[in-house]
């Protein structure tokens, strides 16, 4: 019995030792298995050595400085970890040192540039510009003396006048339009010079006089006169237009003088507006008749107890077309009617059958609406014109909630509108 107990105790002691050994082995295995999982965690024993490189020394002392400093621990680790890397070129530090030297010299260099006064004068001198030379010859242009003893323009004449003194493109205009141009041309001819180029701009003399009002009676010089400076390039076309207008007015005045034998005060100052020229050139329309090929007539049609419509009817037999020109409507609204509620509209059609219905535009806020519209009725032969009638219907258009109001209605035979048919 005693032997059995001792054997049992020995077995328990052996199993305990084996379990402890197994526990130590399992813990080591767990640590080995968990090690790679936390390898990215930075711990104090894993902090690497950092190295801040010094400034590159100048000259050949670079190798001595590196030898004095010695390799650091991080450099040793890198060298041991990557032995297969190619070594640095020995010429690279020298090249970097040379570049740093050149940069330092460029940064500390003070550049002093000396420009020649003659070069500045040749660029900025007044005599270099031919147009400025012409301005310098004018006594009316203010001038100033420079520190070198040269004369230059005190200010630009562009800021004083719209017509520039420096535009020499149409220099002949200044010589032709100036008051002393005739004297200069006479002197040139007396001296034997050719006055052809100066006479070439003589055709523009009348536009210049028309534009400025003629020769000045005052004793102003050619330089102080506006004609002493050349005009702009676009002024030539304007002067030509003025020349044509002036010639047309002269011909009209001559015609009026020959017709009446005298010139009144109103005829001496004709209106220069485009409308007046159109009125002067417009011919009176021929009187309608059987021989004119067209039948027309203007009528006032009463469409209600007090309202009326004025219109003009014209029939073209060659095209079989009737044209009705609606002029205006009168007497349709009284004074008590609110002008804001007026929306007048006229409708036209041919009866019987209500053929070719047409409607005018709506005229608002006017007690005497003016239309001035044309209405065309095509395909009407002479036989149809004698049978048909024109229906005129005047309506005041209502708003969104109101109905249209009939102001008047009238039917007229076309034979009554066309008396010469």
UniProtKB/Swiss-Prot annotation:
Keywords in alphabetical order: Phosphoprotein
InterPro entries cross-referenced by the UniProt entry: C2_dom, C2_domain_sf, C2C4C/C2C4D
Region (Disordered): 13-97, 119-140, 158-228, 250-303
PTM sites of type Phosphoserine: 262, 264, 273
Biased composition (Polar residues): 215-228
Gene3D superfamilies documented for this protein: C2 domain
Stretches assigned to the C2 domain: 305-421
Any Gene Ontology CC annotation: cytosol
Family: Belongs to the C2CD4 family.
Protein name: C2 calcium-dependent domain-containing protein 4C
Gene: C2CD4C
């Amino acid at each position: 019995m005693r032997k059995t107990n001792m054997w049992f105790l020995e077995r328990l002691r052996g199993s305990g030792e084996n379990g402890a050994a197994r526990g130590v082995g399992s813990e080591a295995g767990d640590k080995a298995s968990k090690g790679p999982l936390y390898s990215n965690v930075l711990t104090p024993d894993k902090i690497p050595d950092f190295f801040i490189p010094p400034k590159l020394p100048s000259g050949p002392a670079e190798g001595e400085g590196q030898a004095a400093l010695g390799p650091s621990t991080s450099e040793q680790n890198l060298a041991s970890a990557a032995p297969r890397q190619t070594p640095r070129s020995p010429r690279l530090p020298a090249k970097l040192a040379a570049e740093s030297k050149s940069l330092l010299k460029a940064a500390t260099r003070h550049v002093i540039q000396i420009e020649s006064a003659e070069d500045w004068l040749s660029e900025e001198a007044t005599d270099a510009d031919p147009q400025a030379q012409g301005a310098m010859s004018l006594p009316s242009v203010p001038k100033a003396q420079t520190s070198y003893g040269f004369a230059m323009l005190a200010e630009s004449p562009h800021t004083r006048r719209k017509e520039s003194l420096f535009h020499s493109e149409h220099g002949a205009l200044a010589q032709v339009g100036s008051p002393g141009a005739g004297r200069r041309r006479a002197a040139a001819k007396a001296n034997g010079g050719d006055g052809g180029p100066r006479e070439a701009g003589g055709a523009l003399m009348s536009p210049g006089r028309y534009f400025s009002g003629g020769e000045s009676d005052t004793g102003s010089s050619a330089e102080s006169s506006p004609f002493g400076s050349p005009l702009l390039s676009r002024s030539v076309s304007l002067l030509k237009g003025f020349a044509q207008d002036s010639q047309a007015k002269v011909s009209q005045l001559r015609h009026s003088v020959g017709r009446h034998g005298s010139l009144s005060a109103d005829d001496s100052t004709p209106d220069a507006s485009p409308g007046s020229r159109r009125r002067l050139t417009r011919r009176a329309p021929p009187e309608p008749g059987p021989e004119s090929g067209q039948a027309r007539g203007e009528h006032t049609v009463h469409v209600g107890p007090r309202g009326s419509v004025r219109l003009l009817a014209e029939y073209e037999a060659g095209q079989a077309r009737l044209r009705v020109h609606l002029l205006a409507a009168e007497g349709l609204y009284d004074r008590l009617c609110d002008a804001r509620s007026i929306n007048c509209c006229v409708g036209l059609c041919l009866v019987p059958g209500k053929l070719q219905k047409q409607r005018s535009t709506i005229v608002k806020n006017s007690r005497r609406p003016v239309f001035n519209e044309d209405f065309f009725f095509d395909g009407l032969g002479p036989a149809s014109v004698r049978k048909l009638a024109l229906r005129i219907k005047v309506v005041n258009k209502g708003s969104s909630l109101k109905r249209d109001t009939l102001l008047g209605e009238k039917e007229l035979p076309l034979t009554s509108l066309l008396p010469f048919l």
